[in-house]
């Protein structure tokens, strides 16, 4: 081995060896298979730290399973369909300054190459090479023969087959539906297309149509029941309003809305025409009719009304909305004569319509007064609003004022009222984003009611029932995400599956439309199996007919008929079918948590729609995001840490180890330079340890006579093997690294500090295999230096051996370690120089108390009174009557807080502390630098400060004699 750890040299060496030996190329055999897939990356930029985390988790799982004896398939492809790459090409072609800066400075594209990437095809060709290079640099155990891009003609044939079969099952429908829409691209947008607002949802509002003469002033609300409590409308005097002719289903009305709302209305299923501007003053101070109650309400000025929200006009319910109550109260003494308003607004009576157990008649007024909220700008107003809303929604019922709806729970009334209001023309539906959405092209998006659009019928209850069944049979990691998946399935509605612009596959039954980018990335895991034969040149585009896919993926038809149609040999068709049957279903789909509400859901929906139950996915795993020094990363804006730059700076293994050890699976990780520098130092220590052990030439065996410290090391190693395997099975990579590296390295240091030597080679042999999934290049180098010819990547992963567990040895070393720590702490605090240290082991009666406590807790939960009574009943212990209660009150809480196991080991093994400490005395003396004497607290020979009375089992009392100055 080299003197110093040189990561790049080692990594280049082993990547070349892996590539030449093809050890990660998987073919069916007699072993149990494990098929793991990670979402292929979208190629509108270089891979970043978020990809690094998700892909490395997948690689660690793949390597672990491979070392456990599974036949592992870990493939990868590249996602390029949709509009983002088209948009990026346009920005590069126009030399957009921000884009050119971000992609040269942050993505690392050379300045002489970037300007040439001015077409989608050139971008795809560039980034697919860069992505594969980066993934090879970090050492992923991928079968690269199966790679593809989603614009490959052969892949398009696969997608055409999928959508043909979905349409035949009536799972694709045509109709009108609200979708996220970019007016500039004239296309639906999905999460991959969005610059801001990726988490936004489409929310259905009810527009209540308040009338003034021949005009309608619509107000959007999420709570149509509150229409019964409206006292006034709010109009912003500083906003531009327009009058518009609105026609729907032959009904013509003239609406007054903000300019922003007018723009949004043009994308709905209404015919909307501009008529004229309407100054805000012209609609303030007017008396309107509530379309539900017939009551007269006044419009009042309010600068807080946002023109971009809803219609730009808001209805006010001051009895139940704290902000409305505060706004109305703030106008009581205001001069509103410029709006023609002269009446006393105090005369506006609050209207109570909901009975809430926690409140009286006017919840908003009550909470404003009880919380001491001064005005609308008081931060407590937001909190008050949430409290009232939550209590009304979960516990409120409608009052008699609401007529036939009296007694309905607030939580159940929305859909009923919306239906009835629409039927009576008192209201209409209106769709709005939950937050602003901006397309990657920079255009603010709208909710568009698209006509003649193709939709995946995800709301189909029969389809959802199959997805629920699939989810119920699957393993979800971590388990708490199961509820989220269930909620998302329940929530999922029909989704647009086609667009007019971008890269992708044409709908086979309507060639004017392109299948959108999330819709073509649902069952591509099955294509990896076919891609293997395309790569070999055994399958060509003309062979990929509908009947070919039907047979090899679904088993429908027969190979003879497919052979006759395609010209393929029946033997090849049967071979492809057998490969599919071997590898499918997917054993684990692992992904970042951002894909839970879309990609991972669609993955389930499409699998249950097309495949038989035995081919449904078996497990899903979810991991968190990665930030960079506390900042969220962004491909298009920065900051960003590319996978390639991380590996170039720190090495593959250190990057892998750090990205997986900073946070547990679903937690978000934060990449920090200080943290990865620390990881480098730890890996250096491991390398130095391995080098020393190998160069020593000593190869101790388990058959040799073992000392206590050896038995301790054996036992600790088995615990780490057990915990690491369990953690990896649950994809808790941080926990796995903690056990297989950080905690283990501390124990190895203690072992060596205690003079342990016989098992160092055994430790290294297990350790290097434990770490191989995380730091494969380093471990291959060490494994080879140990004399092994076959790669560690294919070696047997360490398995737990309970026979090597020695609880007594572990407890003994724990006692030695804690005793040393206590002595060192006393010396540190007192700043004394020790002349001699006296250790007093616990008296026999305290050991008996521990044994008695262990026995009692087997029968029932241990209680202080019960233990005292039991001990006092023993004649030989009566003389300790004053001390027993104090000791019992101390140890019982320890038993209950996790200390029972160590006490049980102490009691059942009959550990002799005095002998233990005597055996360790020479070690303690060397560490402390002075003599150590062991005495029993039962009969101490020298105890000038009566310290022995503090001695307890596993916690000797300590007296330090200070060195006198000469």
UniProtKB/Swiss-Prot annotation:
Keywords: Aminoacyl-tRNA synthetase, ATP-binding, Cytoplasm, Ligase, Nucleotide-binding, Protein biosynthesis. It comes from Methanosarcina mazei (strain ATCC BAA-159 / DSM 3647 / Goe1 / Go1 / JCM 11833 / OCM 88) (Methanosarcina frisia). It is an enzyme of class 6 (ligase). Transmembrane segments: none annotated. It catalyses: tRNA(Leu) + L-leucine + ATP = L-leucyl-tRNA(Leu) + AMP + diphosphate. InterPro entries: aa-tRNA-synth_I_CS, aa-tRNA-synth_Ia, Leu-tRNA-lgase_arc, Leu-tRNA-synth_Ia_arc/euk, M/V/L/I-tRNA-synth_anticd-bd, Rossmann-like_a/b/a_fold, tRNAsynth_Ia_anticodon-bd, Val/Leu/Ile-tRNA-synth_edit. Gene3D superfamilies: Class I aminoacyl-tRNA synthetases (RS), HUPs, Isoleucyl-tRNA Synthetase, Domain 1, leucyl-tRNA synthetase, Valyl/Leucyl/Isoleucyl-tRNA synthetase, editing domain. ATP binds at residue 635. One of its GO terms (biological process) is leucyl-tRNA aminoacylation. GO terms for cellular component: cytoplasm. This is Leucine--tRNA ligase. Belongs to the class-I aminoacyl-tRNA synthetase family.
């Amino acid at each position: 081995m080299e003197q110093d750890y040189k990561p790049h040299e080692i990594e280049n060496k082993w990547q070349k060896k892996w590539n030449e030996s093809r050890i990660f190329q998987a073919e069916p055999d007699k072993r149990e298979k494990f098929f793991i897939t990670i979402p292929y990356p979208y190629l509108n930029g270089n891979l970043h730290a978020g990809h690094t985390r998700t892909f490395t988790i997948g690689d660690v799982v793949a390597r672990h399973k491979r070392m456990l004896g599974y036949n592992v398939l870990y493939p990868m492809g590249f996602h390029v369909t949709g509009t983002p790459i088209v948009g990026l090409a346009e920005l590069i072609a126009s030399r957009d300054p921000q884009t050119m800066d971000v992609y040269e400075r942050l993505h690392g594209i050379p300045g002489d190459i970037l300007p040439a990437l001015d077409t989608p095809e050139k971008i795809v060709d560039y980034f697919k090479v860069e992505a594969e290079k980066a993934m090879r640099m970090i050492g992923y155990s991928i079968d690269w023969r199966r790679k593809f891009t989603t614009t490959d003609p052969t892949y398009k044939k696969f997608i055409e087959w999928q959508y043909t079969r979905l349409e035949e099952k009536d799972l694709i429908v045509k109709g009108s539906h609200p979708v996220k829409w970019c007016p500039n691209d004239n296309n639906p947008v999905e999460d991959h297309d969005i610059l801001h607002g990726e988490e936004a949802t489409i929310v259905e509002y009810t527009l209540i149509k308040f009338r003034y003469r021949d005009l309608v002033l619509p107000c959007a609300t999420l709570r149509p029941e509150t229409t019964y409590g409206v006292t006034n409308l709010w109009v912003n005097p500083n906003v531009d309003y327009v009058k518009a002719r609105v026609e729907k289903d032959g009904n013509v009305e003239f609406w007054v809305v903000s300019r922003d709302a007018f723009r949004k209305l043009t994308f709905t299923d209404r015919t909307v025409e501009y008529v004229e501007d309407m100054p805000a003053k012209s609609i303030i101070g007017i008396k309107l009719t509530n379309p539900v109650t017939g009551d007269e309400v006044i419009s009042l000025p309010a600068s807080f009304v946002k023109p971009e929200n809803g219609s730009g006009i808001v209805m006010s319910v001051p009895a139940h909305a704290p902000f409305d109550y505060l706004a109305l109260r703030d106008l009581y003494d205001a001069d509103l004569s410029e709006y023609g308003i002269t009446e006393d607004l105090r005369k506006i009576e609050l209207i109570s319509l909901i009975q809430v157990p926690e409140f009286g008649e006017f919840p908003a007024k009550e909470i404003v007064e009880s919380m001491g909220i001064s005005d609308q700008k008081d931060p407590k107003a937001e909190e008050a609003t949430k409290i009232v809303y939550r209590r009304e929604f979960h516990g409120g019922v409608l009052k008699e004022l609401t007529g036939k709806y009296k007694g309905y729970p607030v939580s159940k009334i929305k859909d009923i009222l919306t239906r009835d209001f629409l039927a009576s023309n008192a209201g209409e539906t209106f769709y709005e984003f939950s937050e602003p959405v901006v397309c990657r092209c920079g255009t603010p998006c709208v909710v568009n009611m698209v006509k003649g659009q193709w939709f995946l019928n995800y709301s189909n209850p029969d389809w959802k029932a199959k997805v629920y069944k699939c989810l119920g049979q699957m393993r979800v990691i971590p388990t708490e995400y199961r509820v989220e998946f269930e909620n998302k399935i329940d929530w999922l509605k029909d989704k647009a599956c086609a667009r007019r612009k971008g890269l992708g596959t044409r709908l086979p039954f309507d060639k004017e439309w392109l299948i959108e980018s999330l819709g073509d990335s649902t069952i591509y895991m099955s294509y990896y199996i076919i891609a293997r034969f395309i790569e070999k040149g055994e399958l060509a585009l003309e062979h990929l007919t509908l009947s070919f896919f039907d047979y090899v993926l679904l088993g429908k038809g027969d190979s003879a008929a497919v052979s006759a149609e395609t010209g393929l040999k029946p033997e090849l068709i049967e071979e492809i079918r057998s490969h599919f049957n071997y590898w499918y279903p997917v054993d684990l789909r692992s992904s970042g948590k951002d894909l839970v509400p879309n990609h991972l859901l669609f993955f389930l929906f499409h699998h249950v729609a097309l495949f038989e139950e035995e081919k449904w996915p078996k497990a899903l795993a979810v991991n968190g995001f990665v930030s960079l020094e506390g900042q969220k990363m962004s491909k298009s804006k920065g900051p960003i840490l590319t996978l390639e730059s991380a590996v170039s700076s720190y090495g593959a293994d250190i990057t892998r180890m750090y990205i997986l050890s900073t946070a547990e699976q679903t937690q978000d990780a934060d990449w920090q330079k200080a943290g990865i520098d620390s990881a480098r130092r730890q890996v250096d220590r491991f390398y130095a340890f391995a080098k020393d052990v190998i160069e020593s030439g000593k190869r101790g065996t388990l058959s040799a006579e073992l000392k206590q410290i050896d038995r301790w090391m054996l036992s600790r190693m088995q615990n780490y093997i057990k915990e690491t395997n369990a953690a990896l099975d649950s994809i808790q990579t941080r926990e796995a690294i903690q056990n297989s590296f950080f905690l283990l390295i501390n124990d190895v240091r203690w072992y060596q500090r205690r003079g342990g030597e016989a098992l160092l080679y055994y430790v290294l042999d297990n350790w290097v295999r434990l770490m191989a999934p995380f730091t494969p290049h380093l471990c291959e180098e060490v494994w080879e230096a140990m004399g092994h010819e076959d790669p560690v990547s294919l070696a047997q992963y360490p398995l737990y051996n309970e026979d090597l567990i020695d609880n007594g040895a572990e407890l003994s070393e724990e006692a030695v370690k804690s005793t040393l720590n206590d002595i060192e702490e006393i010396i540190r605090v007192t700043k004394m120089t020790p002349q001699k240290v006296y250790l007093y082991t616990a008296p026999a009666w305290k050991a008996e108390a521990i044994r008695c406590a262990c026995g009692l807790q087997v029968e029932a939960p241990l209680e202080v009174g019960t233990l005292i009574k039991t001990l006092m009943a023993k004649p030989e212990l009566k003389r300790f009557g004053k001390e027993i209660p104090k000791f019992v009150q101390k140890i019982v809480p320890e038993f209950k807080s996790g200390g029972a196991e160590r006490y049980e080991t102490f009691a059942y093994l009959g550990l002799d502390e005095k002998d233990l400490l005597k055996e360790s005395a020479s070690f303690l003396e060397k560490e402390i630098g002075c003599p150590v004497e062991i005495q029993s607290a039962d009969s101490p020979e020298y105890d000038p400060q009566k310290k022995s009375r503090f001695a307890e089992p596993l916690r000797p009392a300590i007296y330090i004699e200070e060195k006198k100055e000469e």
